[in-house]
Amino acid sequence: EEAESYSDEDYQVSVKWSKINTEGKRSYQRCYGAPFQIQISGSGLVAPCGMLFNERYSRFHIGNITQQRFKDIVNSDRYWEVMNHLASPNFDAQTMCGSLCLQHKVNEFLDGYKKGDILLEEPKGTPPNHINFV
């Protein structure tokens, strides 16, 4: 709440309360958000998320932009092996992921859509601040 108090007419602080208040708990088991927000470490490592940069998660490492083009990495079989694994029953986001996941809201939406709980319809009202907002 203190952070929000720094907002003024020229600067807005937007706290993601819905994300913070979940305390890292997830209603979904699969990670569908990784292809929408893939991450690159400071050393060039490409992985589904920052939590997986650690060497102990090397099975999720997709490539390194210091060794091959990003385009080649995301068009590779390895990319889809990792993405398909994250969306499979062999991966459980509830027990295998850290808290404050960047893909959390995307995962909530896509999981609801996949289960039929969320229907896609033409947007109504004021457009979001950015086309990628879910």
Positions of predicted regions on the chain:
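Flexible mid-to-C-terminal extensions adjoining Fe-S/redox cofactors in radical SAM and related proteins
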Residues: 26, 45-134
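Generic structural signal for secondary-structure transition and capping sites
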Residues: 8, 36, 78-82
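Small-side-chain structural scaffolding
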Residues: 3, 33-34, 49, 63
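Structured beta-strand/loop patches that form or line metal/cofactor-binding pockets in enzymes
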Residues: 18-40
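Conserved C-terminal portion of the radical SAM core fold
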Residues: 1-20, 39-43
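A broad, low-specificity signal for short, low-complexity segments enriched in glycine/proline
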Residues: 8, 24, 31-34, 59, ...
